[in-house]
Amino acid sequence: MRQQFFAKSIIMAFMVFLTFGCNNKTDSSITIKWGETLAESHPSAQMAIRAGKEITERTKGRVKVEVYTGGQLGASKEMVEAMQIGAQEMLTEGVAQFQMLPSLEILEAPYIWKNPETFDKVVKSDIIEEFNKKLIESGNIRILGTTYYGYRHLTTTDKAVHSLNDVKNLKIRVPEVQMYIAMAEAWGSKPTPMNFNELYLALKQNVVNGQENPLPTINSGKFYEVQKYLILTGHIITARIVTINETVWQKISEEDRKIMLDVVNKNIEIHNNEIKSLENSLISEFEKAGVTVITPNVEEFRDVVLKSVPAKLESRWGKGLFERILQAQE
């Protein structure tokens, strides 16, 4: 009996040791799922892969980052919602997708940016920190860094667009965001909000007549395979943000937070340079693939949008914010 009791005691003690040992190990590390809608070949996805690996290595596994590209964790809207409740820990996404803070979308408003240089100046200013505080309050989401996604241009399946009149009644896929819908309506088009991951098939099956995205995204999404024309409208420079759930952030040590910020922003610089390089080289690549490239009357597109969209969305953005960002570029 004594031997049986002794044996059971040893087994129970061992099980307790394993339980507490496992708990201590779990408590000392955090696993982060970093989501991305774009294909693995896109510079933004590659940025996340590089940064995730480096964060894991430099924190010695205290922060383990797993990167999921190509919308594996869901569509944009689904991932933003998952971020709010902590079901997903990190996300790189366009600012307009964070609809719990409508004013944030102004960072990709049509024709608000003069050029990539003034964009870079503003996103490194106090304006971003103001948005960061508001996003933490409204969505429990923190901004770790802001990326340059590139100029957005229009593509069409079979319609050569040289002027504003050529896009009248054209069914254009836009993100599921009010601002994009308002822009396409100002052009006289028929905006068709659609999940990004459904876009290639929709273009192939002529569900929509066209779409708009930056050149690197047109490339990684292979939209040039199902689009005949590329129209260089340059209507939006999109800001995408690298974000983390605030509750998770507060569980990370100060030392590891510094590592994460350093790694993320270092890789953002690499990413931004890659995007700019691709913007310079991809047009000729698309032409080689059989795409006809058109430079339209850009002022027509710009003027009709600026006459209506900022005023229409001022209640969402906040009075005077559009003008403030214009002035910050001086």
List each language-model region with its residue ranges.
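N-terminal secretory/targeting leader peptides
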Residues: C22-T118, I127, I136-E330
